[in-house]
């Protein structure tokens, strides 16, 4: 599911403190929104925010120092610079921007203010640089409009990698998470994980506000991990890099290969995520196994595949006629 709506007043309120901007014109329609088709078609937030450009409609148009000079009558050449200025400013209406932002501490031209009032286009002004405004708004909109879903499991920071522990209820995911926390790793979310596709190649996991810092362990109840283990034991968000799926031993023997030639992946929001399957059985140290799986994944991300190296070594020995034993 991908949200397609945000209003001008919501955008203004979200960054009133950070960007210290003022709402100069276009107060009549604070509910003015982004074009939903443009939001659905956007490949990234860069398609929704940028410097003033007559080729790209339906996006937040940022007017910096150079753009203000372009819209001033003194910059217009010809017999009637005022008429040319009016023409340049009027073209902005055809872009149907949800919001117009004048940055770099510039004073918006009077004709631009009047045009925004007539066309009911919200006009914000800020002392911050145009580049900074673009960075802030792109980051905000990339999260707001991101494809999203929720998954059941425990999401953790293990050795700097975002790892989602999944499996059927009762296998001990939360207990495993608690043991990993005691070994120095960090908790992002327990039970419910909100996942957002924040870019073409990245999925970010966060904890619902209601469950933040909490871990439920059967027989003990709710634990406040931040209060018990300290600030370093929790994380606000992580990029999802690995799924560790816990199964019963009989399920592993029946449904999965012991040494899969091809690595396993699971589709999350249209993006393949590496997956490792670990059997839960008496006497197995799951925390050590998960750490080993994470370390192996780090090697694979660096281009080192132990299993493929072993297969190649085996082929080389067969070709040489030496058993290697």
From Swiss-Prot:
Enzyme class name: transferase
Binding residues annotated for Mg(2+), in chain numbering: 174, 216
Active-site positions on this chain: 152, 173, 191, 258
Annotated GO biological process: regulation of carbohydrate metabolic process
Chain segments annotated as coiled-coil in the UniProt record: none
Stored SUPFAM superfamilies: HprK N-terminal domain-like, PEP carboxykinase-like
Known cofactor(s): Mg(2+)
Catalysed reaction equations from the record: [HPr protein]-L-serine + ATP = [HPr protein]-O-phospho-L-serine + ADP + H(+); [HPr protein]-O-phospho-L-serine + phosphate + H(+) = [HPr protein]-L-serine + diphosphate
Keyword Iron-sulfur belongs to the record: no
GO MF, any single term: protein serine/threonine kinase activity
InterPro entries named in the record: HPr(Ser)_kin/Pase, Hpr_kin/Pase_C, Hpr_kin/Pase_Hpr_N, P-loop_NTPase, Ser_kin/Pase_Hpr-like_N_sf
Annotated keywords: ATP-binding, Kinase, Magnesium, Metal-binding, Multifunctional enzyme, Nucleotide-binding, Serine/threonine-protein kinase, Transferase
Amino-acid positions noted as binding ATP in the UniProt annotation, renumbered to this chain: 167-174
Transmembrane segment boundaries: none
EC number: 2.7.11.-, 2.7.4.-
Domain of life: Bacteria
Ranges for region Important for the catalytic mechanism of both phosphorylation and dephosphorylation: 215-224
Family: Belongs to the HPrK/P family.
Function per UniProt: Catalyzes the ATP- as well as the pyrophosphate-dependent phosphorylation of a specific serine residue in HPr, a phosphocarrier protein of the phosphoenolpyruvate-dependent sugar phosphotransferase system (PTS). HprK/P also catalyzes the pyrophosphate-producing, inorganic phosphate-dependent dephosphorylation (phosphorolysis) of seryl-phosphorylated HPr (P-Ser-HPr).
Complex and partners: Homohexamer.
Domain notes: The Walker A ATP-binding motif also binds Pi and PPi.
Protein name, UniProt field: HPr kinase/phosphorylase
Species of provenance: Leptothrix cholodnii (strain ATCC 51168 / LMG 8142 / SP-6)
Lineage: Bacteria, Pseudomonadati, Pseudomonadota, Betaproteobacteria, Burkholderiales
């Amino acid at each position: 599911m991908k949200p397609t709506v945000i209003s001008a007043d919501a955008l203004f309120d979200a960054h009133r403190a950070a960007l210290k901007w003022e709402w100069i014109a276009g107060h009549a329609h604070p509910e003015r929104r982004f074009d939903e088709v443009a939001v659905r078609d956007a490949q990234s937030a860069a398609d929704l925010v940028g410097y003033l450009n007559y080729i790209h409609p339906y996006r937040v148009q940022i007017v910096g120092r150079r753009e203000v000079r372009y819209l001033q009558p003194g910059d217009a050449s010809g017999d009637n610079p005022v008429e040319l200025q009016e023409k340049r400013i009027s073209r902005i209406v055809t872009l149907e921007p949800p919001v117009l932002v004048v940055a770099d501490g510039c004073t918006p031209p009077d004709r631009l203010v009047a045009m925004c009032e007539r066309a009911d286009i919200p006009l914000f002004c800020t002392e911050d640089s145009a580049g900074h405004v673009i960075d802030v708004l792109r980051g905000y909109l990339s999260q707001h409009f991101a494809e999203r879903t929720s998954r059941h499991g425990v999401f953790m920071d293990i050795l700097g990698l975002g790892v989602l522990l999944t499996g059927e209820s009762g296998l001990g995911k939360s207990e495993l998470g608690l043991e990993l926390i005691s070994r120095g790793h960090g908790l992002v979310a327990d039970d419910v994980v909100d996942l957002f596709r924040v870019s073409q190649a990245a999925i970010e996991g966060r904890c619902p506000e209601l469950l933040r810092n909490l871990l439920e362990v059967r027989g003990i109840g709710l634990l406040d991990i931040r209060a018990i283990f300290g600030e370093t034991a929790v994380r606000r968000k992580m990029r999802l890099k690995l799924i560790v799926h816990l199964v019963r031993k009989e399920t592993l023997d029946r449904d999965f290969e012991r040494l899969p030639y091809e690595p396993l992946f699971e589709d999350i929001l249209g993006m393949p995520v590496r997956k490792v399957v670990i059997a839960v059985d008496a006497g197995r140290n799951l925390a050590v196994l998960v750490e080993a799986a994470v370390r192996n994944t780090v090697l694979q991300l660096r281009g080192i595949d132990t299993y493929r190296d072993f297969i190649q070594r085996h082929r080389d020995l067969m070709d040489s006629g030496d058993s290697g034993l």
